[in-house]
Amino acid sequence: MKMVSLIALLVFATGAQAAPVASKAPAPQPAGSDLPPLPAAPPQAAPPAAASAAPPATTPAADASAASAADAVVDNAENAIAGSDVATVHTYSLRELGAQSALKMQGAATLQGLQFGIPADQLVTSARLVVSGAMSPSLQPDTSAVTITLNEQFIGTLRPDPTHPTFGPLSFDINPIFFISGNRLNFSFASSSKGCTDPSNGLFWASVSEHSELQITTIPLPPHRQLSRLPQPFFDKNVKQKIVIPFVLAQTFDPEVLKATGILASWFGQQTDYRGVTFPVFSTIPQTGNAVVVGVADELPSALGRQAVSGPTLMEVANPSDPNGTILLVTGRDRDEVITASKGIGFGSSTLPTANRMDVAPIEVGARVANDAPSFIPTNRPVRLGELVPDSALQAEGYAPGALAVPFRVSPDLYTWRDRPNKLNVRFRAPPGPIVDVSRSSLNVGINDTYLEAYPLREPDSPLDQLLHGVGLGHRNNDSVQQHTMPIPTYRVFGQNQLLFYFEMAAMVEPGCKPGPSTFHMGIDPNSTIDLSNSYHITQMPNLAFMASAGFPFTTYADLSRSAVVLPEHPNGMIVSAYLDLMGFMGATTWYPVSGVDVVSSDHVNDVADRNLIVLSTLANSGDVSQLLSNSAYQISDGRLHMALRSTLSGVWNLFQDPMSAINSTAPTDVESTLTGGVAAMVEAESPLASGRTVLALLSGDGQGLNNLVQILAQRKNQAKIQGDLVLAHGDDLTSYRSSPLYTVGTVPLWLKPDWYMHNHPSRVVVVGLFGCLLVVAVLMRALTKHALRRRRELQEERQRT
């Protein structure tokens, strides 16, 4: 077996891609779940070198770096084979890889694909693709096919059978040498028929079921313990799914160590971004796999032995129970040095050495200013779309190129005078020459799955141009760049947003059935801009939707320097894990480590009274923090969460504060729960310790539901369900309420304060209008009275003279 593997590696060294090289596949093993899940990405076409049904050469394309890396890869493969007794087999459906529905191809959209990754510490030894689907019975079997490729390497061909439109399951073995760290599985459709057909019609099609399966067998590679490889091996950026990173803490609660751990969790969250990450907490080193150990050197687990350190230290060592596992030590002689060591990763990851150990020098981090999170687009100037995505992400190809997405984040507390909309300046280029019918083709623009505007690819001719074209003197320049400015309503902009551009192309109708080009390009100019500079930062709270979409108001300062986390004096592992998950969420939201947050126990809340507070607790241990919810409509007593009933007067007052509350949300009259069985609650209210500050309480009866509650925050599909000031969560079931008084966070210029005060408050407008009318009446009465008195005196004087 080793000899076969070496032969395969020699093939790789001479002409294969620079990728992990597999040995000959071992005997099939039972399916297992030890392999980290393959990533799921939105289904999108990953265009190959040529979108054609003709199969490419079966020999992988040569890579310039393959030969130089071959020796190292051979050694890795030999070591992996020598040290691995059991291979891991896992089966993934195309839905698990990102296909939300069947991959459908037709004449105008001939390419569908999926992207997925293989962890760098895994070696693929065998793979198989099992596909099923259907093809149009109108297709000609001799000239129509679906070609399957992996990283532009031929896998197989599907041919139509007019008498049996459905096919499968069909099995295709995949050469493991085709796999790389980031993979593209493509399905390319080619069709032809008798006669002349419009490529945009839906008569000729093929579809691959999302239930088709990819089976992969892997074995682990020997670990490369180099700090410069971080975040590997804990996280591989080619893996798109949620990540699990175990943490080991010597003591369950230590404010300084938990602060250092929070910095690390937020950095990992920054790296994982949209994928999501969770941090289970242990007191001992896991028996298998990787883990992060944080603590003072003298308090580290005994299984690691006595580590000699002379200051803040980062170190990677082998898992004592698993030679393939890596333990990252973040340590020092005291707690301050542990925090410094964590900053070495949070702020110095780009300078980490290739060695497995590093002494960290003190790091000074500058103070942050409000609303400067690296992930938030600035609101003081127009922002180029080229700053948000690569230029290649703004280019489209073919008749049905799919939507071009431009994601962006912004602080959700934006307010404009009289709800004036923001501006989007779009510049785009239509295909040159008579390729498509530009008069019937258009660019559709939307935001957050909401339609905004559509523009034809060629602007309508003026009457003079039409006259010149009629006599053959005019000239149309289809290659010109069009520019349009459109409004973006303020209510369409949230914390997480996505601009969508979709080119809808209409094929030219050529006489004599002349074939048109199959490949043409169009695109959005990277100099197109989105402008939020007419916005100010002010909003009404509580509003848990802002927390879900952008971590607001805590992320107003990217390092959370105006925030503190309040934990019980003796928290259990589930509460500490929920705290780390929340810090990971903050890091993924701001792209910045939470170096400014303070961690305190519930009996030291007054030390951070001037900050926004995040409380994580069980109801049984909430005695010291229940007073922090005194400004809310909810109370904690006897191990239960109660809602305080409104009086008629408070209801009237709420009407003046928020007249839409009765429409926007459900305000219950009574809520009582023990929050057990995995149920958790998230409550937001104004802090009783400082006006304008926020308290966010994450509560559970036994701590079991806290991790689920934090994970829900990072799931975009659930964000629309998170509203108001109370959310009850049980699994994916969410219920939102709004009952607490409102308060204002932020400021506006003096000239804008009247507009803010009247905004969405017709009752205030009525009251001010009445006062205005009374004032006008009083002024008029005074003026008329003075005029009458003066007229009376004049009449009296005139009578006296006569």
From Swiss-Prot:
Membrane topology recorded in Swiss-Prot or TrEMBL: Single-pass type I membrane protein
Pro residues bias: start-end ranges: 36-46
Side Cytoplasmic, residues: 786-802
Record localization: Cell inner membrane
Gene3D superfamilies noted in UniProt: Galactose-binding domain-like
Family (UniProt): Belongs to the AcsB/BcsB family.
Subunit and partners: Tightly associated with the cellulose synthase catalytic subunit.
The protein's name in its UniProt record: Cyclic di-GMP-binding protein
Species this protein is from: Komagataeibacter sucrofermentans (strain ATCC 700178 / DSM 15973 / CECT 7291 / JCM 9730 / LMG 18788 / BPR 2001) (Acetobacter xylinus subsp. sucrofermentans)
